[in-house]
């Protein structure tokens, strides 16, 4: 049976901001994102992680992507990487990143805009004894996982954020089969990968290991544009990083993220229209929604 995500539920589950705190109190995120072909994805997901409340957000990417992101979001910390032949992060640099983050207990956000480098990057960053406090896997990281390009030994506190096409590849189904039983698909993802699964779409579903399924009623067709998912992935990672510091769960982070993302889109559509709104417009509305919840 599906449970509805409500405003009051999100208000209770959101990580709080404490007077006696510092940036270390709210966790950190390493976003392995972006490539020469997909630079904007890194900008959107890193800002999403910061807006989601993470104390520190690091971006690992190639230098042109780093330059773009820092010009837009100087609050982000840079981990510049060499460019591989495919335009993405060089796998040797991904190995170095894993070692550098070994004792930092960061949340890994992998996938947005990684392109063809995703398989090598995820193989280097994930696998047995990965150092991450949690992980959010999206986009190209999900496709690499579905193709068996890296081990399925995912860190504890992992969240997958597939759209129906990615979910179909992860489960070995067709998209019509996923859409015909979205709840069953979400539960199967959570059980197969031992993680929280966010099945995006009209009325996004959040499934946790054990069978609990949450249904989100916020959001609209204005989100059907490239970049919306990058923001959701970043927002989820930021909420996960901050929440783990306060005893929250990956399920809590995913539930809050999908509701906030959709609620921001609903407010944005009233300002911009569903047709004209852009994913980047959501940040203004997200701040307004969070402000209402904090009061």
Predicted regions and their residues:
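Small-residue (G/A/S/T)-rich helix-start motifs and N-terminal tracts that mark the onset
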Residues: 1-134, 143-159, 164-295
């Amino acid at each position: 049976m599906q449970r509805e995500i409500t405003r009051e539920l999100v208000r209770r589950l959101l990580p709080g901001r404490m007077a006696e705190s510092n940036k270390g109190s709210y966790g950190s995120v390493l976003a392995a994102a972006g490539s020469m072909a997909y630079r904007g994805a890194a900008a959107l997901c890193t800002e999403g992680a910061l807006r989601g409340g993470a104390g520190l957000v690091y971006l690992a990417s190639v230098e042109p992507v780093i330059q773009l992101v820092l010009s837009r979001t100087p609050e982000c910390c840079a981990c510049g990487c060499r460019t591989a032949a495919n335009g993405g992060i060089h796998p040797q640099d991904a190995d170095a990143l894993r070692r550098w983050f070994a004792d930092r207990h960061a949340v890994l956000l992998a996938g947005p805009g990684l392109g063809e480098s995703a398989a090598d990057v995820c193989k280097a960053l994930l696998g047995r004894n990965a150092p991450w406090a949690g992980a959010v896997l999206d986009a190209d990281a999900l496709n690499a996982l579905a193709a068996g390009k890296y081990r399925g030994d995912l860190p504890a506190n992992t969240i997958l954020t597939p759209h129906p096409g990615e979910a179909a590849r992860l489960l070995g189904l067709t998209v019509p089969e996923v859409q015909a039983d979205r709840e069953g698909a979400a539960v199967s993802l959570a059980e197969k990968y031992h993680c929280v699964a966010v099945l995006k779409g009209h009325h996004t579903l959040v499934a946790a290991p054990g069978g609990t399924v949450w249904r989100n009623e916020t959001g609209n067709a204005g989100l059907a544009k490239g970049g919306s998912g990058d923001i959701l992935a970043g927002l989820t990672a930021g909420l996960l990083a901050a929440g783990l510091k306060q005893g929250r769960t990956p399920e809590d982070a995913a539930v809050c993220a999908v509701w906030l993302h959709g609620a921001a889109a609903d407010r944005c559509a009233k300002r911009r229209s569903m047709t004209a709104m852009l994913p980047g417009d959501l940040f203004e509305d997200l701040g307004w929604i969070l402000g209402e919840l904090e009061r």
